[in-house]
Amino acid sequence: MRKIEQQMNNAISNKVDWNSSNTRVEYNNNTNCSTVVLHRTAIAVYDHNTQALKLNTGGWQSVTTKSRLNAILSELKCGFRVFQKDFDLYLSTNHQTVDFWDGMILSGGQIL
């Protein structure tokens, strides 16, 4: 995991705002949610109350986007990972692989 991703994950875990290079974390105290922004795209929103994670590429299925999403998934110990095959994104667990779609929500090891 890259240093920037470790710092990003620390900000999510500690519920603080953080910014470095092209990545930032915005914590909203009113909603108790952390939003991860890559460039100008919110790629993940983590609800600390429900422990649900909403994923989004904003159409930017780049190596960096996948790396940031996988770092978050690893930190939250969701059991999921994002990968690309033949230009299509997928989300996998130990049990299944599904097509990735923007707006998918993960919670309790399930895709909602």
Regions from the PLM with identified roles:
Residues 1-112:
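Terminal leader/tail segments of proteins
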